């Protein structure tokens, strides 16, 4: 689960990290009131969305007067911001964060992630802050420094000092960086995070370190332990289909193709998408109904797939191991009868009660294409999608 910048900075402040006092505003009146409370004569206005690249898209701007604040809010509030990290529709802007401008001497980069290979938390730091870290890793990998945290002892101050030396820090900056490093590690573990990023972590003109930006991603599987974080969830930033799928324990990810997919098992779902691509098609989604698929969940899965107007055909690929193919078939028939599916549906059933499932489909008198092989299913789906366009 992603947090907004202002929410992330609130977490940082709770852990004693250096962040400025800012105000999140939902209308112009709140914004004008906020700048009266903020120090300085210039402020930063930041559109709050769950995506990076806001600055390049115009969603972050220095404002120098009440009129500029009013203009910025009028332009962006209630609109959608398209960045390199969003789709073509962009993300809705319901809040804008205002904070004082900082006098920056240098920009650094600091982040923490879970390294899947070592199964440990890894901190990454670079002296090239304020830019895309992927670009730094590709063009100047020697400027990206890594530290792995031993889960038995946790983050140690000496590791923070080592990173500080590599970043070219000196004097009191080294001690301050080490403190920031240790507190971030504590935050990462205690709040069950999967990503934490400060880009940039800046050195101010007074030589103090400061968290100018903040990005936090919480592990969805641990949200039940953190009701305080769960209450920060902003559903307006999420795909409504994915949110609906979550209610039914369906694993759904929207894509940009035109062939809807409903599969049981993540591996089989990925394989199904691959074979669709192999035959020249484009999957519209990843959807895993899971091993405990029921008739009701299959119906809901169909409804979610068909809310995507781009879908021109649906491919159902079920391997009946835990789940019974006849139950899936009944769910498919019920879904089509209830919601009136107008696009071709190609069904491949294999495994437990597959013959019975195919018989149920055949007796339904619906416009279903039942096939035996995955290759044939993919070919039929690709052809059907092309004919429907």
Curated annotation (Swiss-Prot):
Disulfide linkage: none
GO aspect biological process, one term: tricarboxylic acid cycle
Matches recorded under Gene3D superfamilies: ATP-grasp fold, A domain (3.30.1490.20), ATP-grasp fold, B domain (3.30.470.20), Succinyl-CoA synthetase domains (3.40.50.261)
Ranges of residues in domain ATP-grasp: 9-244
Assigned keywords, A-Z: ATP-binding, Ligase, Magnesium, Metal-binding, Nucleotide-binding, Tricarboxylic acid cycle
Assigned EC number: 6.2.1.5
Cofactor binding note from Swiss-Prot or TrEMBL: Binds 1 Mg(2+) ion per subunit.
Pathway annotation: Carbohydrate metabolism; tricarboxylic acid cycle; succinate from succinyl-CoA (ligase route): step 1/1
Cofactor: Mg(2+)
Reaction(s) catalysed by this chain's protein: succinate + ATP + CoA = succinyl-CoA + ADP + phosphate; GTP + succinate + CoA = succinyl-CoA + GDP + phosphate
Residues engaged in binding ATP: 46, 53-55, 99, 102, 107
Annotated positions binding substrate: 264, 321-323
InterPro entries: ATP-grasp, ATP-grasp_succ-CoA_synth-type, ATP_grasp_subdomain_1, Succ-CoA_synthase_bsu_CS, SUCC_ACL_C, Succ_CoA_ligase-like_bsu, Succinyl-CoA_synth-like
Root EC class: ligase
Pfam families for this protein: ATP-grasp_2, Ligase_CoA
MF terms in GO: ATP binding; magnesium ion binding; succinate-CoA ligase (ADP-forming) activity; succinate-CoA ligase (GDP-forming) activity
Family: Belongs to the succinate/malate CoA ligase beta subunit family.
Function field: Succinyl-CoA synthetase functions in the citric acid cycle (TCA), coupling the hydrolysis of succinyl-CoA to the synthesis of either ATP or GTP and thus represents the only step of substrate-level phosphorylation in the TCA. The beta subunit provides nucleotide specificity of the enzyme and binds the substrate succinate, while the binding sites for coenzyme A and phosphate are found in the alpha subunit.
Alphabetized PANTHER family for the sequence: SUCCINATE--COA LIGASE [GDP-FORMING] SUBUNIT BETA, MITOCHONDRIAL, SUCCINYL-COA SYNTHETASE BETA CHAIN
Assembly information from the UniProt record: Heterotetramer of two alpha and two beta subunits.
Protein name: Succinate--CoA ligase [ADP-forming] subunit beta
């Amino acid at each position: 689960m992603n947090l907004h910048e202002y929410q992330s900075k609130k977490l940082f402040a709770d852990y004693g990290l250096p962040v400025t006092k800012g105000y999140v505003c939902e209308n112009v009146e709140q914004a004008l009131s906020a700048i009266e409370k903020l120090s300085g004569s210039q402020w930063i206005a930041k559109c709050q969305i769950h995506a990076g690249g806001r600055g390049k898209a115009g969603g972050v701007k220095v404002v120098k007067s009440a009129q500029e604040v009013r203009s910025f809010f009028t332009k962006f509030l209630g609109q959608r911001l398209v960045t390199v990290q969003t789709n073509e529709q962009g993300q809705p802007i319901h809040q804008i964060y205002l904070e004082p401008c900082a006098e920056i001497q240098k920009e650094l980069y600091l982040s923490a992630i879970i390294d899947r290979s070592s199964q440990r938390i890894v901190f990454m730091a670079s002296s090239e802050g304020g830019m895309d870290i992927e670009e730094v890793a590709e063009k100047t990998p020697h400027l990206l420094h890594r530290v792995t945290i031993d889960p038995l002892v946790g983050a140690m101050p000496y590791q923070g000092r080592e990173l500080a030396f590599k970043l070219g820090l000196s004097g009191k900056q080294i001690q301050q960086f080490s403190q920031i490093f240790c507190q971030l590690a504590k935050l990462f573990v205690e709040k069950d995070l999967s990503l934490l990023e400060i880009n940039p972590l800046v050195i101010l003109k007074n030589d103090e370190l400061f968290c100018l930006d903040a990005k936090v991603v919480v592990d969805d599987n641990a949200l039940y332990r953190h009701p305080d974080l769960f209450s920060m969830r902003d559903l307006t930033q999420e795909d409504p289909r994915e949110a609906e799928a979550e209610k039914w324990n369906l694993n759904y990810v929207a894509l940009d193709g035109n062939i809807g997919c409903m599969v049981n098992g993540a591996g089989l779902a990925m394989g199904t998408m691959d074979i669709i691509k192999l035959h020249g098609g484009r999957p519209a989604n990843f959807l895993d109904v899971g091993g405990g698929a029921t008739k009701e969940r299959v119906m809901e899965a169909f409804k979610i797939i068909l809310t995507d107007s781009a879908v021109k055909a649906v491919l159902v690929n079920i391997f009946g191991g835990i789940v019974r193919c006849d139950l899936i078939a009944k769910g498919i028939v019920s879904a089509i009868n209830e919601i009136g599916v107008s696009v071709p549906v190609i069904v491949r059933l294999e495994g437990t009660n597959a013959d019975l499932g195919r018989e149920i489909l055949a007796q339904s008198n619906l416009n279903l294409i039942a096939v035996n092989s995955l290759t044939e299913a993919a070919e039929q789906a690709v052809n059907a999608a092309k004919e429907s366009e």
